[in-house]
Amino acid sequence: AAQLDGNFVELAGQAAAALSEIRQPLIRLGVRLEALIEDAPDWLDGQGRARIEGARYSLAWRIDTLSAWESLLGRMGGYDGDNLPAPDFVDWLAVERAEGREFDVGLHRRFLDPMKPFAKMVLEPSHGVMLTSATLRDGDDWQSALARSGAPYLDVQPMLASAESPFDYASRAEVLIVTDVKKGDISALAGAYGRIIEACGGGVLGLFTAIRRLRAVHGRIADRLARGGLPLYAQHVDPIDTGTLVDIFRDDPAASLLGTDALRDGVDVPGESLRCVVLEQVPWPKPTILHRARRAANGGSAHDDRIIRARLAQAFGRLIRSADDKGHFVVLSSAFPSRLLSAFPAGTPVHRMTLDEALQHLTSRAFSGPGAGVVAPEEERNPLG
């Protein structure tokens, strides 16, 4: 178990043994009650039977709870419920909170590599499988693509194929990295979103990494934009399902839409309705226990970079959906490491500039053309370490 000393693991084993001593008598009592129901004596009436059934269900619930805690304590030493080593899993205890209140405590288990069960349950029984995605491969790295597909768990050698994009990103798109929006300043972030939407005349897809910031930005700018004839819709704010929000956004070139992961990974809005994608910050992975375990098993910071590049590529992919599309991809963060720029298609111009300079670009809809992007060698240490 990560970050647990030997004494802690030993105490966990003692606690598991103590819980087992409580659970075993409950099991025996449950068996006796079940036998009493099956071979009921003459004096057992309907009410008595109902009380015994209730006691059985109550005992079963307590037995299951104790078993779960025993399993957790066993996992602290790196073992599963059968006292066998369990290196393929990550276990943790989490408190669920809503609106500042704690309402549940959960014992969670996930595969260290989710592709292992995927390969067993989906790939192995299939006659043939085709996996395709614009972000399956990280640059020219086929090894990462194979790992993401589950192919290493199969005995067959997969057939590999790649195709170049038909779109001219170098002359149809620009990446603008805005350097003067302070991180954590919601007012400045909202002001930047509002000014960008006004400069573009709508047609903006705003992507957030946190629902709280999305709601805060929407609350500050929606009324002002609406008065200017620029409707603003938002996932997690408007009581409309995501598919309908996207349809409304697609049908109104003056509308803009704010959202989170679902919009970053699955929106198809070609044409004038989507002219600009705005990302509030670099989409770093959340430093959860599960992520830290997978990070440690897959190369540390290189694992994080692969995730971020895939997310950036997905977000950028919302912008150009047909040969006639053009637009800008704006990142409101100066802390954008140059090593992540490979997420964008080769030849796409990339600029670091202030918000005012970015607004001039958006207002004129000017494109600098191939090879015009000049990027300062600015790096940031991954906040996950």
Predicted segments — roles?
Residues P125, G228, P270-S273, F344-T348:
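Short, structured coil segments at secondary-structure junctions
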Residues K182, R213-R215, G219-T244, I248-F249:
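Conserved C-terminal RecA-like helicase domain
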Residues R148, I196-A199, R224-G228, D252-A255, ...:
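Conserved, well-folded catalytic cores of nucleic-acid-processing
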Residues V330-G385:
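N-terminal targeting/trafficking signals and adjacent low-complexity tails
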Residues G228-L232, R275-E280, R352-M353:
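Short hydrophobic/aromatic-enriched beta-strand-loop microsegments
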